Amino acid sequence: MDYVEKLEDLLSQKYTYHEIAENLYLNYSSLIDTDEVYRIRKRLSEIFGCNMNDVRLIGSAHTGYTFKNDKLEIRKNPKDYDFAIISPNVFAAYFHKINVNKIETRNRGNYTKYILEGKIHPLYADPKFLKEMQTLYTMIANELDIKRHITVCFYLSEKAFIEGLVNYNHKLYSMVLKRIRDSAIRDLPEMVVKDIPKMEG
């Protein structure tokens, strides 16, 4: 499945941004090596003590595209596996492992913003927590012989996960929707003129 085409199709059918995020990230499987993704998801679920369905692949490894600097880029061979763990229990456990007083000043704003949205992004946690997570990523990659870099974020709930994706992808969805609408408007005059009956002189 082409995720860009699917995104355009869902927007054309007037799905809401939330429904699009649910479809693309909860309903459809990832584009790349699903056996490898399965092995990583299974291992992450064992390590974090959650269901395998609580572990979701996101990012360009899932959709085959990334959106940077207002440009949609196709990624046929992504460098990373970005995972989301959607579990209130795991979220609470890892929330309490973070030493808020040790978070670097430059990261505090992002850490607080994400926590209020029901997300833990290890990149903005304290250095010790981040290092432990990076060690874990390396261990999993070595254990399963994975060449791509692995990262994990934690979400309090499925609602927080979808809201986060909508916020992250809002600009992309709006850009694609505008392109669809502009295309429809460009086609409109030709159709209207064609459908007007000729006047007999």
Describe the predicted segments one by one:
Residues 1-79, 86-201:
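Catalytic core of pol beta-like nucleotidyltransferases
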